[in-house]
Amino acid sequence: MKRKSVMLLAILLIAGALVSAITYQTMQNPDNGNWKGYEKEWAIVDSLEGQGLPASALKAAEAIYVYAKTDKNDEQIVKAIIHKAKYTSMVEENEQIKAIHLFQEEIETSSGVIKSVLQSMTAEIYWNYYTNNRWRFNNRSKTVDFKNEDISTWDVTTLHQKTYDLYVASIANREELKKVKTTRYNEILLKGDEYGQMLRPTMYDFLAHRALDFLMNDEVYITDPAYAFNIDNPVVFGSNKAFAGFVFSAEEVESKKLLALRIFQDLTLAHLYDPYPAALIDVDIKRLNFAKNNTIINNKDSLYLNALIAEEKLYANDSSSTRISFLSLSCPLLQVVVELKR
């Protein structure tokens, strides 16, 4: 089976070759005639990190950030912010809280694609803070000592809601994001192979899938009310065309699960008529797994298996169908049927 390879947001970017002979002195002022271009200046940053000088690397990254701001280079701005957060975590305590403050400040002054990327990254940092400090929240209710600027005083509901809100905000500008190719941001995305790029061709694909990855985590729903939306319509196991065209009632209770389904619909519509179905198949597989794990329909296992079999037949001539075959063959219900026929 062809290994799935997608581009992942680089919170800690991979360091390049070290240039040990270069020092921070040439970086102090990008306008003093010493500016060497982004590639060489980042080599200086990498060199300083390699020499175990995170404080100097931080200052060097800050210099690039200032230059990128003047240059209005969104890609380099985000890359510099990522490195600033990285080196801040090396030289200061409470690194996640510091990183959150850094990203929040940037969100307030940013716009367009760069703002969406920062919102998605900040959401991930919030969620990582929760998972790393889950034990702190186990018995904590809403506290009278709550401070909006101090995440360590938050309760689990507040933290979950903040994470959710940021992921939602990151894809709010979906039409603009759909127009921007992920290849434009190769400096801040870990580049996958050609197949991986087919799965995430636009920044909307990239950010929407990140939001879905969050919404597919069962732990996200522990603070939801008992009257939350339930997935009880078999259309979630239907063909991509049937699912994409289904209209969920406006009277449905707004919930995280309903939002997830609507994101799946939007991604499906975006790729329904692609010349190559790799991105569509990827969305279909993800949607079917989400449906199987979240629906209250009694015969969900058979609906899931039948959906996989239908999908496999539909895309039998495409290499991506091997992923569907693997899932259907590993389906417990199919294994039971095989045993009964023996």
Model regions and ranges:
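Bacterial Sec-dependent N-terminal signal peptides
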Residues: M1-Y38
